[in-house]
A protein has these predicted regions:
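Short alpha-helical segments and helix-capping/turn motifs at coil-helix boundaries
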Residues: 12-18, 38-43, 79-84, 341, ...
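Active-site clefts of carbohydrate-active enzymes
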Residues: 52-76
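Gly/Pro-rich turn-and-neighbor structural signature
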Residues: 1-52, 194-221, 236
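C-terminal non-catalytic alpha-helical accessory regions
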Residues: 133-287
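Beta-sheet entry/capping signal
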Residues: 3-7, 27-30, 54-56, 93-97, ...
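Aromatic- and carboxylate-enriched substrate-binding clefts and catalytic-loop regions
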Residues: 5-40, 47, 73, 95-149, ...
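Extracytoplasmic
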Residues: 283-443
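Catalytic-core region of carbohydrate-active enzymes that cleave or remodel glycosidic bonds
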Residues: 72-99, 116-121, 254-264
Length: 443
């Protein structure tokens, strides 16, 4: 048996069994898995890297299950695939890479990126993931059109990173509580909703302009690689966010219905030519894909306080970090090495305390079982803050649905002309996305 290739895959709860002491023969390859949402759950230790069987990875860009499926559109951010698979290779996961694709058509670019990285990771690293995507678009549509399309696709991936089209109904799958089957408000204020709708509207318009200028022989390729994924995602957001506004008397229900009809029309167009029967906009017939039920609410929309200062990880004035190209809510998240510091500066503060909201990538520990950081203001004492999650906990579900892990704290602040906020990573694997400063609002 030692000569027969064998693989052990500690998927989901099986990883807990492995961590509890399960012994695997040395010649068996250990196949590490992501959490189904793009974040690898375990990286091999030095002992595991030395095993005869080596290490592999089983990675998802499509998933059926809790907290919610994403089977329709290929929206896993290429920068996340790049960041996680680069880290996997650096950590000794080099024997075998397996990609769970689901429906291959919506995810053609991510599949190509994954395979190119598996074949020659250094070549992809040298050009960067943005350049890789641009070359993909140039090959299909020519240089000039690729120059115009790449920012469109990058923005489409960024918006879907914040929340996937399939997650826009604030519903869940495979939950016992029936409330998760009912479309409900996302925790967004009116301004956030309108800004997101405007961003998608702008993308959709740009895609439509290119469509009309395309030669006939390129229209089918363009429709399934660009027009359908961007405009269908835009209409999904339009359908559900307009409905959220309409529930509070802030929009017309007819706009939500028209968005649903647009998705139906786009999908029909997809399935009437070369790619007939390849696209289904209602995988598993989940509630989020239906026309939204008209239901008025007496309560108002969520109101959020305005942050006084906001920074992306890359906005630090001092410190050593690695920018994760394109990753994060604004594409400027940074990987912070263990014990390294990032410094952010702000002006005089009006009160004697400040609420600090730290937003991080919801990834898993790289070494050991912890993900921790500290925050220090003007040299104040620090306290370790943990944000790793366990299994399929409620916090983990919330994290993967919104692609951030959030921690809040209130710190005392002195009356002075300027201040220095220092973020320190205590463990490997810390990726800082954003920091927000508010007037205190938590107890």
């Amino acid at each position: 048996m030692t000569q027969v290739p064998q693989v052990f895959i500690p998927y989901k709860e099986v990883l807990d069994v492995y961590h509890a002491g399960l012994q695997v023969p040395d010649e068996v390859t250990l196949m590490w898995c992501d959490d189904n949402y793009g974040y690898i759950r375990h990286f091999p230790t030095a002992e595991e890297r030395a095993r005869k069987g080596g290490n592999g990875v089983y990675y998802h860009i499509s998933y059926w299950g809790r907290p919610h499926d994403y089977l329709w559109l290929g929206t896993v951010h290429p920068s996340l695939v790049y960041q996680q698979m680069s880290l996997a290779c650096e950590r000794g996961i080099q024997k075998m890479w397996i990609l769970n694709v689901g429906d291959i058509k919506p995810a053609e670019y991510q599949v190509e990126l994954f395979l190119d990285m598996a074949w020659n990771l250094e070549a992809v690293k040298q050009q960067g993931v943005a350049a890789h995507q641009r070359h993909f678009l140039e090959r299909e549509f020519g240089k000039n059109r690729a120059d115009r399309l790449q920012p469109v696709m990058q923005e489409a991936y960024r918006l879907a990173y914040i929340r996937k089209p399939e997650f826009m109904g604030n519903t869940r799958t495979e939950e016992k509580d029936p409330k998760f089957k009912v479309i409900s408000d996302l925790p967004w204020c009116e301004q956030e909703i309108n800004e997101r709708l405007a961003a998608y509207r702008q993308l959709s318009d740009k895609v439509e302009q290119e469509w009309h200028a395309l030669p006939a022989q390129k229209k089918e390729t363009y429709f399934q690689l660009v027009k359908y994924p961007v405009q269908a995602a835009a209409q999904m957001n339009n359908k559900l966010l307009t409905a959220q506004l309409a529930r509070h008397g802030k929009a017309d229900w007819a706009d939500s219905d028209r968005a649903y009809d647009s998705i139906v029309s786009l999908t029909k167009r997809y399935n009437t030519t070369k790619w007939n029967r390849m696209m289904d906009f209602q995988p598993r017939r989940l509630p989020v894909f239906n026309r939204v039920e008209r239901k008025a609410l007496s309560s108002g929309l969520l109101e959020k306080p305005q942050a006084v200062y906001t920074w992306n990880g890359a906005d630090c004035v001092e410190g050593a970090s690695v920018i994760c190209e394109g990753l994060g809510y604004e594409g400027k998240a940074v990987a912070v090495e263990k014990k390294k510091e990032l410094t952010f500066e702000f002006a005089a503060w009006e009160t004697d305390s400040v609420e600090v909201e730290v937003r991080l990538l919801p990834n898993h520990p790289v070494e050991g079982e912890r993900l921790r950081f500290t925050i220090s203001l003007d040299g104040s004492a620090t306290e370790a803050v943990s944000y790793e999650t366990k299994g399929r906990s409620e916090e983990w579900k919330e994290n993967v649905l919104c692609n951030q892990a959030v921690r809040r704290m209130i710190l005392p602040v002195a009356r002075k002309a300027s201040h220095r906020l220092i973020f320190t990573a205590l463990d490997e694997g810390v990726v800082l996305d954003q920091i927000y400063l508010y007037m205190p609002r938590i107890k």
